[in-house]
Amino acid sequence: MNESFDKDFSNHTPMMQQYLKLKAQHPEILLFYRMGDFYELFYDDAKRASQLLDISLTKRGASAGEPIPMAGIPHHAVENYLAKLVNQGESVAICEQIGDPATSKGPVERKVVRIVTPGTISDEALLQERQDNLLAAIWQDGKGYGYATLDISSGRFRLSEPADRETMAAELQRTNPAELLYAEDFAEMALIEGRRGLRRRPLWEFEIDTARQQLNLQFGTRDLVGFGVENASRGLCAAGCLLQYVKDTQRTSLPHIRSITMERQQDSIIMDAATRRNLEITQNLAGGVENTLAAVLDCTVTPMGSRMLKRWLHMPVRNTDILRERQQTIGALQDTVSELQPVLRQVGDLERILARLALRTARPRDLARMRHAFQQLPELHAQLETVDSAPVQALRKKMGDFAELRDLLERAIIDAPPVLVRDGGVIAPGYHEELDEWRALADGATDYLDCLEIRERERTGLDTLKVGYNAVHGYYIQISRGQSHLAPINYVRRQTLKNAERYIIPELKEYEDKVLTSKGKALALEKQLYDELFDLLLPHLADLQQSANALAELDVLVNLAERAWTLNYTCPTFTDKPGIRITEGRHPVVEQVLNEPFIANPLNLSPQRRMLIITGPNMGGKSTYMRQTALIALLAYIGSYVPAQNVEIGPIDRIFTRVGAADDLASGRSTFMVEMTETANILHNATENSLVLMDEIGRGTSTYDGLSLAWACAENLANKIKALTLFATHYFELTQLPEKMEGVANVHLDALEHGDTIAFMHSVQDGAASKSYGLAVAALAGVPKEVIKRARQKLRELESISPNAAATQVDGTQMSLLAAPEEASPAVEALENLDPDSLTPRQALEWIYRLKSLV
């Protein structure tokens, strides 16, 4: 049967009718249909689930005359299966039994209680703890894009309005949403194709009036002026759709989503998608996390601190007041790192616990962890109180104390609660008198049964008699088969076993009813008290979220203080003067993976020295030198200390990199096309305050096409845009640029060649390189000796053709580098055919005269 169901379900059994009606409401996602201790899937859902989860596909009888494909998973293992599905971009509707089987006529009443989607998960089992999990929505009109993101596990709600396609692509790269909502008429599908968790939504969900109404209702406001987003119509369209989707899937109130923030380009350093990829900030070029900037810098001790640090790295701020405050805090905290980090480690992931509290899905162990976090606050306050720093004291104030809530949770929750409240044993003894009474009644069963067993043995004289309990038959008196014929007349047989008989007596049955009632009453009351705890905690949610944010920021700053001390970083100085001056700068990642000391290098960029033409051998360190400059600037603009002896840095609005390239086969773009697209983006968007890294421009095409493009790009950047530029090249003709224009200088990375070997010095020197050492590098790479020999031969031949051809033809027509050598003269031909060993002295003399006549 296909899932495009006919609306007439009358041919099906009542249970399948109920299932099909629920499934018709959620046709595009999997439906987990609760039946007893299992969640069942039927028809096409069962087939898909069996493939996605590698579970058995079976059949369940027949309905409407056809066998029903079925697959099932145990309810206690549902989180593991949900995690697998979410990681594959699937969404699941969870359908629970809400009716009482004992009183239901026909199928037990069921309804979908929540929808689990990749972008709306909050359960810790489904989340990557050190990575944000974002739901996003994108909207487009003739003026640009609207983009909104929400981290439901923290309540962080952001919107932006990228003006063009490149900026929008950069935002998608930066935020990397787990789920992306888009309008059904979205025109730029190429922009989002291939992304995980794509969800097509109807146009009406993006209506601006509906969006304003939804957002005002959520925040309890009359307008959005206070959030600074009133006029961001494109962003609001996206935000409205996103909020509607969250409400549809969560089916509960969202008190932790209390505000929305506008992210403006002018507030942060802009990095496009290529730059984020090339700088390997949180992901390396192979898609992993090893040997990235975050891998070196992130030694935070809480998951929420780790997530905040990654947000900082992907969004460096331009406000130097904020940056200087962070620098001051890092300096002030350096002496207390070893005391603070062990305490902070105990705080855990308070941010996500609070989100689950707001959604009323927090489990007993979440509340125990919250209590443990509160218990660390007095120690943190005591340690920070002595730190002489206004920013530190401001953070300490935001952390709060929450002594009353700590006391409440200490009284209410036992030390090591079970996973689920339905298992009982969550509320601590002494917290509620009535609960203690019901528990005492239930727990007193053991003493009563021991007394009953002793009494009945003495009364009957049956030494094999014992009293027991099982979940199926309840309490019983058991007598061995050999003595069962001696059972008293008031013993009513309940169960026959191979070697024994089990009985019940009125007294035991009466006690059983009493105990089971007390257990049920205790569990029901415990669940009620647990829910009341939420009601007591939620009024403090805003203060708790502020505290969690302050603790995460403290973790980040303490971590940066530790990294600065451990890795020998220094505090950079911000200046209003354009430029970057670095003394003994180092690459933060490369220096950690090298087995030998890293060679530190200087850099000086200023209005009088805007562009460096960087030459030198392959493997000499040109790309490392360029990237380390960008990473030092990036670290400075998150407020961190930097890997250098001294850094003075002026205003930077954007960082661009044109470093390396590969075919983009999915989009049908060659390596050269990718290179030129990235170059065009730089030339259109760079400003005099931009930091631009250009590596080997033009190498993807013919020599003189490439040289001409590289020359023109360098001219444009130096003369028109006047950006701060590092321009690495193997075109030695470009080393003439400093002679032709102001603000351009040559530097090179040194190497020493000895015979057929080469030693890279990795040190930056003024002036142009003398040669490229390409053949020496090829020999190091293991290219066969005969190939290297032939290459040297061809190199000499090419150099003899026109050693200065390139310099004289930069603006001229392209000359063939592999032109055929000139015809040999008759004298040369005669010599080639001559065998000197076969000549007599007289013949040799004659040949000399003959050759002279041929010259």
Swiss-Prot record:
Entries under SMART domains matching the protein: MUTSac, MUTSd
Positions that bind ATP: 616-623
Coiled coil: none
GO molecular function terms listed in the Swiss-Prot or TrEMBL record: ATP binding; ATP-dependent DNA damage sensor activity; damaged DNA binding; mismatched DNA binding
SUPFAM superfamilies noted in UniProt: DNA repair protein MutS, domain I, DNA repair protein MutS, domain II, DNA repair protein MutS, domain III, P-loop containing nucleoside triphosphate hydrolases
Keyword entries, A-Z: ATP-binding, DNA damage, DNA repair, DNA-binding, Nucleotide-binding
Pfam family, one: MutS_I
Entry GO CC: cytosol
A GO biological process held by the record: mismatch repair
Function: This protein is involved in the repair of mismatches in DNA. It is possible that it carries out the mismatch recognition step. This protein has a weak ATPase activity.
Family that this chain belongs to: Belongs to the DNA mismatch repair MutS family.
Protein known as: DNA mismatch repair protein MutS
Protein source organism: Salmonella dublin (strain CT_02021853)
